[in-house]
Swiss-Prot record:
Organism encoding this protein: Plasmodium berghei (strain Anka)
Function: Calcium-dependent protein kinase which acts as a sensor and effector of intracellular Ca(2+) levels probably in part downstream of cGMP-activated PKG kinase. Plays a central role in host erythrocytes and hepatocytes infection cycles. During the liver stage, involved in sporozoite motility and thus in sporozoite invasion of host hepatocytes, probably together with CDPK1 and CDPK4. Involved in merosome egress from host hepatocytes, probably together with CDPK4. Required for the release of hepatic merozoites from merosomes in the host blood stream.
Active site: 238
Protein name per its UniProtKB record: Calcium-dependent protein kinase 5
Gene: CDPK5
Family in the record: Belongs to the protein kinase superfamily. Ser/Thr protein kinase family. CDPK subfamily.
Single GO MF descriptor: ATP binding
Amino acid sequence: MCEHKANNKNDGEFVNLKEKNENNHCGNTKSTIADCDDDYSIITLCTKCLSTKTEVNKNKIILDSKALKDSRTKRRSSVNINIDILNNNLNLSPYFDRSQIVQETILMNNDDLEKLYELDKYKLGKGSYGNVVKAINKKTGQAKAIKIIDKKRINNIERLKREILIMKQMDHPNIIKLYEVYEDNEKLYLVLELCTGGELFDKIVKHGSFSEYETYKIMKQIFSALAYCHSKNIIHRDLKPENILYVDSSDDSPIQIIDWGFASKCMNNHNLKSVVGTPYYIAPEILKGKYDKKCDIWSSGVIMYILLCGYPPFNGKNNDDILKKVKKGEFVFDSNYWSKISLDAKELICECLNYNYKERIDVHKIVNHKWFIKFKNYNHITINKHLSKELIEKFKKFHKLCKIKKLAITCIAYQLNKKKFGKMKKTFEAFDHNGDGVLTISEIFQCLKVGDNEIDRDLYYLLKQLDTDGNGLIDYTEFLAACLDHSILEQDAVCRNAFKIFDANGDGIITKDELLNVLSFSNDQMPFSKEIIENVIKEVDANNDGYIDYDEFYKMMSGRQS
């Protein structure tokens, strides 16, 4: 069954799986192999679209120093685009550049963050660059986690910039959300989704091992997140139980993959060379200096192995000992621990831990593995006629909204706590048949089971309208936005947060240039006609002054627009 040699007996107890050093909401541990620059092109933050470039501003990490103004707190200005030179003959539908939801702000004084958030003195985690603390937004009352990074301790600015860029691209139920980025003279602040349920590692220590069904529920979420990021040519490179958090302490709490500091772009047929990772979970090809996305599959296989038996497949007295065994890639299923584990589970582990990474199972094929299919049927959620009708009505309501309101609701859906979407999150996952973290129209059709051809055509058009970023798929936030309870739109703090995303320079109005800053044409970044942008503005601009002020914006959002 398993191609690996059976001559590497378990060394006994789980030795130093994690050296507890007060951490670890951010996932930095002493056993993590020292990082170095990738052979892939360095990615830094550009002013508008975060495109790739190589120049580094050593004074500021998220913003150019020229953005500093006399005001105490200043948002990044939108790109100055001359509307008049745009092609007036284009009649294109604008799409939403959703990376703009993550706001970047320069703080003029070191204490300005505490005017926005009430910071808890208790540390959620501690890493090599700084601490992670719980924080309460003083306007909305929402709880977040803030990763406070001491800029003096940063030894790889490009890695940090790449982490921010990659997190801005993520939109998956099991990947930690980045909400905001702040920077002052001394520190960088990453405002993140708060997870209060602890690490998967701690659950392993507490329970020792998990049943196959409990293991399936965890691995399903891990593989879904990997399928999502691999489809975007992103690899994590440091997947381990310490970097997997539970959202809350409930028995059915979802998990979140955190710490994308070692993540990198890896295009198809492209190999990386940098040696990064953690000894227990690192793939042997990384140690050899030539690897691709499937290094994450190896790490996942190690996690699955540990969940089922309570100890790692490659164990040792110290890191050198562990790495020697990883290089050999030999492991066994000790009958003392594995006799009651199914053959299908062992086969999947062997496919994940295939020493030849080119032959290792692809993440998109795992969902069709026998072991996965068996448990998927146990956990099948039926979309009944009542829910089907309810969803179609929500999609129709969303379709009728003006363009800016659709985009603003998308911003709100991204910012809200996951607990607000418990039912819809499960519905999204039920629709996601292939487990890749996004929905196709075909997947939604299959679940809604709409048989009437005329309704099918109408539904197809409605579903196309949900795709606000124009990537041809219904992403997690897009689905939640269409299902959002509109009563929340009457909350002033919620609307102000959404308004801020469009009002890039913070002057209280949304201009044509600022609207262009968050819009694009499909994935081609083509310009819009002057008429398209003006029409989007006119839908909300009650006094016809060419701008959208907050009063107009709030009336639109709350449904009080005349």
